[in-house]
């Protein structure tokens, strides 16, 4: 199934970037006044997305227990983001609703790869549905104090916390340490370097363990709710995130790679179109579009976001043929990691270059099992 390059409603100043210059940082939607610096306060109060450097963010991280729950939670989330890798962060103040603030953030500056809100909210389903409708653009990281979530939303990471129902101060902020750690991990992934693609699984991000026993682990694993688990392995005791999945079961690292690849192709297209007199609606034009798609795919192979020689099931092979209508595409995916093509279509009065990119996503080995044969 061909996926058309999305229509750009508006081009932000930082959207036209050099090749490899795509940035995906984290966004926190806050219901409280957490930005107080003179250079940003007016924009923040006006509902604009504010980008804070690491130093600017750290300067705002004083959150005494006398602060409201929302302030403490939002600041602690930002604090953890910087502590675990994010070199800058984005924040936007909640307007009438969290959903409205998220929609406004998307319209203003969509260069955030992952985002969270500063509290548990009955709007989470609405936000997840809207985010899913946007395609591979953002990862929604959400706190969950129970394992009852039955939704299978795409691009949503549910994170378990066990801090109860505290109502103010640093106790509530503790609930959001894990969200901040996940946002920091997502914002710090190296999407350009060799083998930079990452997985949330097995990462010790410095947060407290919330799951200690097998029965609880199995409950949360079945619900695709992530947690920091305490594991004892024949002596050493370790804690790390498990299982690193989105609500629909996809690896969260794979989702972030997909978001980056989509953004890279979109930005490369804008740069191509702006740098030419025109891109012709013929085979020459489709070849130019295909060329930028192939370049992104090749970079993803180097990065580990696309895997060469990954075993494919019969069902996956049938799916490739169904999508591409080309049996040779299976061999291409197995030997090079991907298959791509592009074609010109007339949609209404506009010619659209629709591309198809099928690739072996960068899954990781989740466990090791073996047989010992003594002879």
Question: How would you label these PLM feature ranges?
Answer:
Residues 1-375:
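Surface-exposed assembly/interface segments
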């Amino acid at each position: 199934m061909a996926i058309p390059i999305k229509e750009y409603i508006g081009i932000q100043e930082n959207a036209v970037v050099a090749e490899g210059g795509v940035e995906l940082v984290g966004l926190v939607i806050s219901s409280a006044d957490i930005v107080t610096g003179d250079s940003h306060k007016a924009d923040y109060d006006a509902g604009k997305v504010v980008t804070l450097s690491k130093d600017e963010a750290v300067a705002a991280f004083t959150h005494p227990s006398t602060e409201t729950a929302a302030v403490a939670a939002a600041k602690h989330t930002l604090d953890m983001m910087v502590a675990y890798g994010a070199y800058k962060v984005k924040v936007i103040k909640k307007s009438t609703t969290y959903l409205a603030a998220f929609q406004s953030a998307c319209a203003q500056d969509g260069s955030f790869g992952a985002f969270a809100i500063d509290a548990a909210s009955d709007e989470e389903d609405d936000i997840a549905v809207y985010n899913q409708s946007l395609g591979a653009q953002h990862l929604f990281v959400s706190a969950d104090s129970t394992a009852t979530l039955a939704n299978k939303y795409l691009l949503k990471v549910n994170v378990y916390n066990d801090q109860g129902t505290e109502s103010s101060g640093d106790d509530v902020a503790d609930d959001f340490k894990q969200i901040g750690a996940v946002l920091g991990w997502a914002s710090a992934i190296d999407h350009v370097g060799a083998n930079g693609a990452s997985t949330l699984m097995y990462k010790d991000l410095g947060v407290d363990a919330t799951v200690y026993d097998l029965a609880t682990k199995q409950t949360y694993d079945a619900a695709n709710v992530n947690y920091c688990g305490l594991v004892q392995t024949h002596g050493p005791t370790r804690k790390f995130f498990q299982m690193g999945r989105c609500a629909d079961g996809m690896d969260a690292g794979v989702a972030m790679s997909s978001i980056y690849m989509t953004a890279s192709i979109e930005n490369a297209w804008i740069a191509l179109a702006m740098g030419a007199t025109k891109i012709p609606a013929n085979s020459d034009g489709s070849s130019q579009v295909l060329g930028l798609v192939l370049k992104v795919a090749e970079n993803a192979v180097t990065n580990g976001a696309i895997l060469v020689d990954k075993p494919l099931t019969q069902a996956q092979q049938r799916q490739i043929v169904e999508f591409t209508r080309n049996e040779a595409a299976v061999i291409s995916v197995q030997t090079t990691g991907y298959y791509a093509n592009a074609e010109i279509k007339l949609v209404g009065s506009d010619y659209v270059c629709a591309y198809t990119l099928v690739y072996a996503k960068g899954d990781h080995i989740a466990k090791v099992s073996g047989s010992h044969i003594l002879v």
